[in-house]
């Protein structure tokens, strides 16, 4: 299902829009020009119907496609519905903002980087700073922080309502009992914890994502602590659909975990996030620990800067324990070394 260029809202200014419109709607058909403009505000709460923002339009398009699938019951279908919220900017119809009181939101207790963490490890939240109503440097005010958290909740509730419409259409079209549904996010989000906003880090709040699966024959209402990677979703879908997964797929099916939440698929997972100057942060997460190894690709292992966190004793990641637990570090680095080394997203061009 197309995204309908919903991120173009970032480049419109509120004062340029008629009161019955939204920044997002105003720019759906002007996306080429939108990229030439400075970013607008980080939030918006126009008193408009759901389909005046992108996710409402996406939901309507998904429903049309489900209705078309009903007309061909003998044909299987695959539908990828990519909702944008709660990505920045935090925009949603006013009724979703009205679900919450901004003053009721508590600010994070921990608003500083982990003790002993390298200076470059926390995100500088440049994505948020690009918006005209956000500071170019320094922290946001407590009022701004509450407003952003309010916006995140409103945007999440808005997306949830659109998802509900799609699921209702699946049911009303008689497709629900024979359809596999997977809901997941592509990253987490810092909401002021550790003094950070946005994603772009290797910390738990940014790296951990929700994954929800509903499928025929799978009992609902269960939770699991099993570790998975997003690469595991493809082979899981293939197994649930009784289809062979391509041999070259890196992921592992977790279909058996859906039947038995106490089962496991992986003993650890890997994720990566870079920093300037060519540094790559390769992270390994087990049920108890996360180790982050910061170094340039192909650099000697002894050049690495390390972070280690113990979620059993320190779930909030308040202190880097790498110097205090060398045995754990050595064990996790040995596991990490069994995986291919990550490369920069954009290779440095050789100077001529």
Predicted regions and their residues:
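Short catalytic/ligand-binding loop motif for oxyanion handling, primarily in non-cytosolic enzymes
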Residues: 1-3, 75, 85-92, 99, ...
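Catalytic-site neighborhoods of secreted/periplasmic enzymes
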Residues: 1-49, 199, 281
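Active-site regions of oxyanion-processing enzymes, predominantly non-cytosolic
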Residues: 2-24, 54-114, 159, 171-180, ...
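C-terminal cap/loop subdomain of S1 sulfatases and analogous C-terminal strand-loop tails that border
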Residues: 4, 8-12, 18-19, 70, ...
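Active-site rim elements
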Residues: 45-53, 141-154, 198, 218-228, ...
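Beta-strand elements within well-structured catalytic alpha/beta cores of enzymes
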Residues: 76-83, 152, 156-159, 163, ...
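Histidine-centered active-site microenvironments of extracellular/periplasmic hydrolases
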Residues: 89-94, 169-222, 229
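Long, internal low-complexity/basic segments
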Residues: 126-147, 155, 159, 277-280, ...
């Amino acid at each position: 299902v197309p995204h309908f260029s919903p991120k173009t809202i970032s480049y419109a200014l509120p004062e340029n829009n008629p009161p019955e419109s939204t920044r997002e709607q105003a720019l759906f058909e002007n996306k080429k020009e939108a990229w030439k403009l400075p970013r607008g505000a980080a939030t918006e709460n126009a008193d408009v119907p759901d389909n005046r923002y992108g996710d409402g339009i996406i939901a309507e398009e998904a429903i049309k496609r489900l209705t078309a699938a009903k007309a061909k019951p003998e044909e299987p279908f695959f539908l990828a519905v990519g909702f944008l919220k709660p990505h920045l900017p935090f925009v949603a119809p006013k009724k979703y903002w009205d679900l919450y009181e901004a003053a009721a939101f508590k600010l994070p207790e921990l608003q500083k980087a982990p003790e002993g963490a390298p200076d470059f490890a926390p995100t500088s939240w440049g994505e948020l700073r690009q918006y005209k109503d956000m500071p170019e440097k320094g922290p946001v005010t407590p009022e701004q922080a509450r407003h952003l958290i309010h916006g995140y909740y409103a945007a999440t509730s808005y997306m949830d309502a659109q998802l509900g419409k799609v699921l209702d259409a699946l049911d009303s079209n008689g497709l629900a009992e024979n359809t596999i549904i997977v809901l997941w996010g592509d990253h987490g989000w810092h909401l002021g914890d550790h003094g950070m906003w946005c994603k772009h880090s290797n910390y738990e709040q940014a790296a951990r994502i929700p994954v929800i699966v509903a499928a025929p024959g799978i009992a609902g209402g269960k939770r699991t602590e099993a570790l998975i990677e997003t690469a595991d979703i493809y082979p899981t879908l293939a197994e649930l659909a009784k289809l062979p997964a391509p041999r070259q797929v890196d992921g592992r099916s977790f279909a058996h975990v859906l039947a038995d939440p106490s089962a496991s698929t992986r003993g650890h997972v890997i994720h990566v996030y870079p920093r300037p100057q060519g540094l790559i942060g390769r992270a390994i997460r087990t049920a108890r620990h996360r180790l982050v190894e910061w170094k340039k690709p192909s650099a000697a292992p002894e050049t690495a800067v390390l972070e280690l966190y113990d979620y059993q004793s320190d779930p909030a990641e308040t202190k880097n324990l790498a110097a205090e637990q060398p045995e754990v570090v050595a064990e996790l680095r040995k596991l990490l070394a069994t995986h291919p080394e990550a490369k920069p997203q954009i290779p440095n061009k050789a100077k001529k």
